[in-house]
Amino acid sequence: MANKTRWIKSRIKSVNETKKITRAMYLISASKMKRSRDRLDSTRPYFEKINEFMKDLVVHGMQTNHILFEGSYKEGQKRLGVIVISGDKGLCGGYNANVIRSTLNLYENLSNKGEVIFFPIGTVGKNFLSRHGYKVEDNFNYQTQSVSVKVAKGIAQNVVKKYYRGDIHELYIIYTKLISTIKQDVVVKKLLPLDPSEFVSGEFKKDETIRYEPSPTNVLDVVIYEYLKGIIFGAMMDSYVSELAARMTAMDNATKSADEMIQKLVLKLNRERQAVITQEISEIISGAAALK
């Protein structure tokens, strides 16, 4: 019984150490999540204004014959690019599994149309796609946790350049949108070619007071690029915040599970101690009876 008591004490100590780690990870994720949401909120007004410019340019008909609206595919095998935003680490519940599941579903749908090329952002997604033999773009090394407008700019330049060259004819993005701390949804969005109907849905009055210099077409090139950069940055930030929220939930659940396990082990330890005491009392009584 003494050995069993020592084992239970060792187990309680081990679970306590694990609980400290999960609690610390919960607090770190909560702190990072708040800072990341503040960053996302601070950049939102700028990208909302870019979206308004896009609407106005489309209403003016400036998208006509523009390659980013009309498409770059002419003939031969079609190539479809997919930006996949996953996490850099695990211990975040089903976050990465949900992204990978949506990625594989999209691959099944797109593979009938042509060759699918992945542009992974995040270590987990990249490792999975490479390990299972999917075509992954070379020299495309980005981490979710290093998200910034500068990084989003580099990604936008990379994929738009490939689109202009005809290396890809369509572009999609898979990311995770934060609904609440305990709920995150995976979103699949088509980025290129752009769909004019996305910008003219609902009521929108074109602003006749705006003058585009040197010309609306030149302005459109810049605005489209800024729009795509904003979409990619927003998707990366949303995904990163969602990953942190998922990790918070997972670590909170792990901490609660550790508490429950410790309670059960303490109860078990007390029972073992009680059994030892009962046995010792029985031995004393038996010894005393033998002496009579």
Curated annotation (Swiss-Prot):
GO terms for biological process: proton motive force-driven plasma membrane ATP synthesis. One of its GO terms (molecular function) is proton-transporting ATP synthase activity, rotational mechanism. GO terms for cellular component: plasma membrane; proton-transporting ATP synthase complex. It is found in: Cell membrane. Disulfide bonds: none annotated. Keywords: ATP synthesis, Cell membrane, CF(1), Hydrogen ion transport, Ion transport, Membrane, Transport. It is a peripheral membrane protein. HAMAP family: ATP_synth_gamma_bact. Belongs to the ATPase gamma chain family. F-type ATPases have 2 components, CF(1) - the catalytic core - and CF(0) - the membrane proton channel. CF(1) has five subunits: alpha(3), beta(3), gamma(1), delta(1), epsilon(1). CF(0) has three main subunits: a, b and c. Produces ATP from ADP in the presence of a proton gradient across the membrane. The gamma chain is believed to be important in regulating ATPase activity and the flow of protons through the CF(0) complex. NCBIfam families: ATPsyn_F1gamma. This is ATP synthase gamma chain. The lineage of its organism: Bacteria, Bacillati, Bacillota, Bacillota incertae sedis, Caldicellulosiruptorales. The gene is atpG.
